[in-house]
Amino acid sequence: MTAADGMVIDASVVLGWLLESDPDPHASQAMEALDERFALVPVLWHFEVANGLRNAVRAGIHPPETISAFADRLELLDIRTDSVTPQLRRLGNEAVLCGLTAYDVSYLLLARDRGLPLATFDGELAATARSTGVDLAFEIN
């Protein structure tokens, strides 16, 4: 598995692409890259995306049937769920060390352990990735 083959993509990028009527160009670029590359995500990603979709429905931004439509769009992409879950000790220690949530650390560790770039709109996660030698799929402003 090489960086040229794939990337770790967090829920912020996917939700920015799915939910926005005019998606951020970085989100569109990352998702278009999945035509030729794969995305690797932690199990947590599925919960975060589902919750983001639920929040959009609950806020009246999208009707309930869009959840299935969005899921159908995502199923067309090569999004792979990592089968290795970091141990509680490692997640907790890294979260304290980095000053991030354990949720964000799961993406950071996945990118670091697999040698893949990270796609995120989370500024703190991006800064920590950069400072710990994890490449970013794109730079955010």
Q: What residues fall within each predicted segment?
A:
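Alpha-helix capping/helix-boundary segments
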Residues: 13, 45, 86-87, 107, ...
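Short beta-strand scaffold positions
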Residues: 9, 41, 102-105, 120
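Short, well-structured N-terminal submotif of metal-dependent ribonuclease cores
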Residues: 1-44, 56-68, 132
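Acidic, PIN/NYN-like endoribonuclease modules and their adjacent C-terminal/linker elements
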Residues: 1-6, 108-141
